[in-house]
Amino acid sequence: MALAFDKVVLFGDSITQLAYDQGCGFCFGPAMQNAYCRKFDVIQRGFGGYNSDHAATIIKRLVEQETTIVFFGTNDSIVPESANHVPLARYKDNLRQIVATVEQAGAKVVLVGPGPFNHHQFVAANGKDFFCDRTTLRARAYCDAAMEVGAELKVPTVPLWYLVMEELGWKEGDAIYGLAELPADNPLNEYLSDGVHYLGKAYKVEFTNVIKAIKEFYPELDPDRIPEKLPAWDAITSLDALDEAIA
């Protein structure tokens, strides 16, 4: 009989797909694996370019117990002229469908709302002739929508737009880093690689707050409370006892 581990699924777009890229510095994926090492398997299911329409379509084939971290909205929030845009109302409906599918499978869910966007960094990475189809205010609106769905369905939500901005010292009423009309030299340059995708500082904000949400809302899934699989090496009394521990 195989040694079975429960699973945490990281389900999202390119920000999740890149969450194991060691070039980013601190990485969300390996940090989650380390937190659940020898306790749960952490499965990466990141799909670059996907939006919540795509996610709602494929979630039924991806969900596994015990926990699914759902992070979509970055691509949904692009301007309506772009093919990947998903209107706010449909985005919220898609999140409701995803949460329902996860919960019907007997798993817990944590929603993650999109983080901020940095206009000048995006233009520098893609060239001035590249159509800039995003704004940080649109990203904020979709983060708000994710928070609204989480509150409605009573599932935890990690509002990355606010969490990253607050870590930069921003507060409501301040000028918003990342806007086209503000200087290119701003603190988001240390959190984003190209105006959209994350560097280690942003992934650390995500990790810290996902774990915080799990501890608060699903204490039974707190990695600090879950025992490791199999006895410690110096507690093994015999190979037969070890074999029995797997059964």
What are these regions (language model features)?
Residues 119-162, 200:
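Substrate-gating cap/lid alpha-helix
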Residues 90-93, 97-100, 104, 141-148:
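Alpha-helical scaffolding segments of alpha/beta enzyme cores, especially the outer helices
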Residues 1-48, 52-66, 171, 219-223, ...:
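Serine-esterase "nucleophile elbow" of acetyl-processing enzymes
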Residues 77-89, 129-135:
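Surface-exposed cleft-lining segments at the edges of enzyme active sites
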Residues 44-46, 113, 159-162:
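Residue-level recognition of beta-strand->loop/alpha-helix junctions
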Residues 2-7, 148, 152-154, 165-167, ...:
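Conserved catalytic region of serine esterases and O-acyltransferases that act on ester linkages
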Residues 10, 70, 111-112:
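Structural beta-sheet core signal
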Residues 103-109, 155:
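A short helix->loop->beta-strand "cap" motif at the edges of active sites that frequently abuts
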